[in-house]
Amino acid sequence: MQDYVSQLLYAINNYNPDDSESVNVLRDLVCWVSDNEMLKNDKVIAELLYIASQKMRVFGYNILNNFTEEPIPSTGYLSNISGSSITNLYRSKVYSNNILDKSQQEVVDLFQNLTVRRLLVSAPTSYGKTFLMREIVFLNKDRYHNILLVFPTVALLLENARMMQKFVSDNALNYQIIKTVDVALDDETNYIFVFTPERALQLIAAFPDLRIDFFFFDEVYKIDEDYCSDGTEEDEDKSSSRNLRKSKAEVSTQEFLNEDRGKTFRIALYLLSKTVSEYYLAGPNLAQEHFGIGMLRFLSSNQITVKEINFEPTLRIAVNAYNTRIEEKMPKCLPDSKNTGLIPHGAKVNDRIKEVVSYIDNKKYGKTLLYCNSPRKAAEYSVKLAGKMDKEIYDSFPDNFKMFIQHIQREYDIDHSVDEWSFIQVLKKGFGIHHGKLPKYIQQEILEQFNKGTFDIMFCTSTIVEGVNTDAQNMIILNASKGGEKLTPFDIKNIKGRAGRYYHCFVGRVFYMGNIY
């Protein structure tokens, strides 16, 4: 067995927060060892994992490992240290049992200490950007009477409205949560509006005299039509030439809708930035040197401070699954992977999907998302996979989910053909489907059941990789496009980021069914 004690000791002693290589080595070791129950049951290794988390100030590792704040009892090999003095510095002001990571605390402190409290935070997926928003709101609860939170989708709006309702209730705050513009407002009441950009514009139009003290704008990259994820002039020239060659008739509906929504995002942010003094903007994987001219001008003219965080707390393993072998690409500090699987030569895509899903199941790697470029593809792939699987796990479903399926059968029983509807058949086989063409309440129920563990495979489109949170450990990228457009490096980063959510798992695996770069 590999000498993880020596490796951890060496990585801890050579850890330098300003050296990305030493940071990544210690992260990879901590995540890899923590993901192995047998390894971390060793008392020396457990103590080293605790010390590594404390030294990195990435406290989510200890929380996920169920390590207490007090040091693990000394084994005699290592000096005993007290962790409480460290963790108390990073304790959440909202929930005292939560500990902020060092970089998270830096974001909160930076906002609080700014002369002009306007901040753009770029951080990896699942970093906790909305969690930090709640910290900021709590610290300023006596100053902020009306708060506006803007999220890009209705699914995110509903998820965050529930979180904010709990936040207000748990802390006995004097706020009323509002999700729709069709309400009567009272000057004596404090409000937290949780809206999409479209609803934010409706609010501004309906209540022009309403004073908003603070706003939060999520997925802010959507407002920059010039944003280029790889930042090369050559790619910008290619993109411009491609668009010029297209006639109006050739521009897809999806492209038109994306452009239209982009304008809505920009107008909403522009109007809010002109009337609100303090705000916090957030987005994933944004690199300032790749911002378009419009975004740079917006940041400068509004005196917005930019905070970039590049550290990924989860070990993410790339897995090639597009040849005849499934091969995991391991970091140098970890042993070469013996976890390989074979795919029959010339296997068609649906057979290949079955092999990869079976590989994940046999390795007990956990829950899996399968990214598809359209609802049609999600339906096609899921039906094919369901047809290749012998099991039907409907009888093992919890009663509330059985009732949900029965409700769908009653509600959508058109010409008594609902039993033939592929969606029902796929659900009964234990696979979820999530895309924007499904009614919102169905999307929400499917997502909740996936997170509860009712089923562990879900076919999805871009609707679930643009901010909706799951606890999936694996992502299989089936298509290299989104709608009719090729995935950009920025899109790929966001999709990859859905495998291995921080605070839920240590290791995420991304399976590539084709060479997407």
Feature map (PLM): residue ranges:
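N-terminal helicase ATP-binding lobe
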Residues: 1-517
